Amino acid sequence: MEINVDEEAGIIKEETVPLLDDQNRNRDLPDIERNTMMQKAIGKTFQTTANLANLLPTGTVLAFQILSPICTNVGRCDLTSRFMTALLVSICGFSCFILSFTDSYKDLNGSVCYGFATIHGFWIIDGSATLPQELSKSYKLRFIDFVHAIMSFLVFGAVVLFDQNVVNCFYPEPSAEVVELLTTLPVAVGVFCSMVFAKFPTTRHGIGFPLSAK
């Protein structure tokens, strides 16, 4: 701020001087906007990948998150820990795949029955109920169920790659190429799977998923 004194009128005038000149502000603004847009894009991508975890069986993801630090010894693996971690990932991955073929049925009394979709209809696990043939056929196995099962398996793989304990267990000293792959691959899988699930949403409400209103 500059203060000018008008000697003839005896009036003190204040003139405001901008802290940054227009030239510097116009030169810096595009970089700021560009960085902000990039940060938003990256944040949205990671948020999309995180939201995909909601498409996985809740119990499977919870079990993996609880057992991962134990099996990996918080990322400091020996041969036994590495074997246990591989076994944990395999079991949870298979669980995500196979549970994609489960569905639920709520009867008039409000009781929920879980079962597997088959090529003939719906097989209730505990045999507590028997659905009419026409209703059972509406639950039968379809090709899209296999697509959803594969996508669930891939999404779980992305969740595993975001787990630093597992990554440190199998890659304690990763090369630059491996670090780049471990960073970009889960994001790519998340974007691809989100597009598939958005285009072909699942209608199943199986074990570990929200209940069906049917």
From Swiss-Prot:
This is Protein DMP6. Expressed constitutively in leaves, stems, flowers, siliques and roots (e.g. root hairs). GO terms for biological process: endomembrane system organization. It comes from the Eukaryota. It is found in: Vacuole membrane. Its main location: membrane. It is a multi-pass membrane protein. Involved in membrane remodeling. Belongs to the plant DMP1 protein family. GO terms for cellular component: plant-type vacuole membrane. The keyword Transport does not apply. Keywords: Membrane, Transmembrane, Transmembrane helix, Vacuole. It comes from Arabidopsis thaliana. The chain crosses the membrane at residues 52-72, 83-103, 143-163, 178-198.
